[in-house]
């Protein structure tokens, strides 16, 4: 159970998923129970699939680091168990009503050289074909420079008037959600500034920003255990998105696929920073 960007996941032949929560539920005829393993490191769960001549089917949990800390929830029904679980962890917030409607999305529009025209044409096509639509997911092409993605960077050649474009969507009754990524490529226009301020996860050997493979290059992931990083991120969302008329964010590629198991963060109490930040 390690958070990986598992694009193309196959339920039959592959293990990794995008996100993992080490919580299992068992249902019996007269009782249901759940086990939540409170450990942020990479872990393994064997739910009775191994065969041992000397033992009946058993379950096994193994963690790369940390304590054996778990919670047991019981109830007559699975619903009782899940209610107890979310009382401990907190619930998912209800999204706005518009988030339940049809939402358009494609990388084609924002990757096109005339992205703004393509996006405006989407509005016209919805009207032409009487397609009800409540929102559009703005893929990361709007941030690109030479094909690579740079969070909080508008490509004004593709989208020369972000505010005008946003207003056109609003006039048509559509909300906009913009793609953002919590990792800066090594040649991001603001990489040096962010590195100098110590806002990245740090390499365990050099104390320099840790670099991992990310979107056709190498990049450094932001350390959100640092309050200054949170403030920098909030400033970027506000000035580059909300003030441009964007209604919501699409937090993408946030698996934190960091393979340096000893990488350091401001408030890191366990191994596997990838799991800590992704969860």
Language model segments and positions:
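Short, acidic/polar
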Residues: 112-129, 229-239
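Active-site mouth loops of central-metabolism enzymes
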Residues: 102-117, 219-232
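Catalytic and substrate-binding clefts that recognize carbohydrates or anionic sugar/phosphate headgroups
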Residues: 1-99, 105-108, 115-117, 123-128
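Aromatic- and carboxylate-enriched substrate-binding clefts and catalytic-loop regions
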Residues: 132-279
